[in-house]
Amino acid sequence: MTVIGIDPGSRHFGYGIVDAKQMKLIHANTINLSHDISLPYRLKSIYEILLSMVEKYSPDEMAVEKIFVGKKITSSFVLGYARAIAFLVAAQKEIPVYEYSSTEIKKALTGYGRAHKVQVKSMVYNFLHIDKKISYDCADALAVAICHINSKTNFM
């Protein structure tokens, strides 16, 4: 089984594909888009790239980080648009989608739901035996995938 993890964002959209059986990194990247590009065109780019990755790697399941609504409500709405793109791609390819909160993800990887980004990234490197540098957005996406794999393993 392969899982694609998604760390949604309209400017930095992380995704990572993991082989659940071998707990091995298949592919990960960050879609980096300029703030100068209007939102509809950033979303279009995310859609096209994510769709091509899903078509290329055929993940069995998708795991997406839930939205945390903070002080900037507008940012949460924009984040919601990026999540909607991931959901659309999943629906088009009939891939089941699972959602996890930031706290759930951190707890699954570090044992502590309020862990710092550096700790989460370090655990992603350890779980997947990564020897190359990856962005925080990639690490977060891979963390969502690992969280999902762990949740399925613990309940099977």
Swiss-Prot record:
It is found in: Cytoplasm. SUPFAM superfamilies: Ribonuclease H-like. Its main location: cytoplasm. Mg(2+) 1 binds at residues 7, 137. Pfam families: RuvC. Mg(2+) 2 binds at residue 65. CDD domains: RuvC. Its cofactor is Mg(2+). It is an enzyme of class 3 (hydrolase). Binds 2 Mg(2+) ion per subunit. The active site is at 7, 65, 137. Keywords: Cytoplasm, DNA damage, DNA recombination, DNA repair, DNA-binding, Endonuclease, Hydrolase, Magnesium, Metal-binding, Nuclease. One of its GO terms (biological process) is DNA recombination. The keyword DNA-binding applies. GO terms for cellular component: cytoplasm; Holliday junction resolvase complex. Homodimer which binds Holliday junction (HJ) DNA. The HJ becomes 2-fold symmetrical on binding to RuvC with unstacked arms; it has a different conformation from HJ DNA in complex with RuvA. In the full resolvosome a probable DNA-RuvA(4)-RuvB(12)-RuvC(2) complex forms which resolves the HJ. HAMAP family: RuvC (MF_00034). The RuvA-RuvB-RuvC complex processes Holliday junction (HJ) DNA during genetic recombination and DNA repair. Endonuclease that resolves HJ intermediates. Cleaves cruciform DNA by making single-stranded nicks across the HJ at symmetrical positions within the homologous arms, yielding a 5'-phosphate and a 3'-hydroxyl group; requires a central core of homology in the junction. The consensus cleavage sequence is 5'-(A/T)TT(C/G)-3'. Cleavage occurs on the 3'-side of the TT dinucleotide at the point of strand exchange. NCBIfam families: ruvC. This is Crossover junction endodeoxyribonuclease RuvC. The gene is ruvC.
